[in-house]
C-alpha cells in the first residue's frame, strides 16, 4: 500500500487507552473534555458509567469492580480500533494495574479531595506519563 502525502491509514495505528486519574475535583473531566476530540476518542467517565450500572459502591471491592468494568468498556472500543480516554479516580496502584492504561495522566492539582474515604485510600502513582 502506498500512502499519498497527508494520507494516513488508521489500520496501521494501534488504538490507545489513556487514563486521566486523580482525586475528585482535580480536573480530570475538564481535561478529558478537551482531549477527547483531539484524539477522536471514546470517552469513559467513571461517574457516568457508575450511573449507567447503578453501582455506587466506593469500597475497595467496589473500586476494583469499577476498574474492571472500565477496562471491559475500553476494550470494546479498542477492538474497534478506537482510542479511549477514561477519567476516574483510580485511587490505588492495584486499580490502575487492573485498568491497564497505555498512558497515565495524573492530575496532581490538589492535595485533598472532597471525600475523606478517597483521600485515605489514594496512593499517588509511582509511574505516570504526564
Regions found by a protein language model. Name each.
Residues 17:
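Walker A (P-loop) ATP-phosphate-binding motif of ABC ATPase nucleotide-binding domains
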Residues 97-98, 107-130:
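Small-molecule kinase domains that catalyze NTP-dependent phosphoryl transfer to phosphate-bearing small molecules
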Residues 26:
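ATP-binding Walker
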Residues 61-112:
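Glycine-rich phosphate-binding loop used to anchor ATP phosphates in small-molecule kinases
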Residues 23:
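P-loop (Walker A) phosphate-binding loop of NTP-binding proteins
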Residues 20:
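Hydrophobic anchor at the beta1->P-loop junction of P-loop NTPases
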Residues 32-73:
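Conserved substrate/cofactor phosphate-moiety recognition/catalytic segment
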Residues 29:
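Walker A/P-loop
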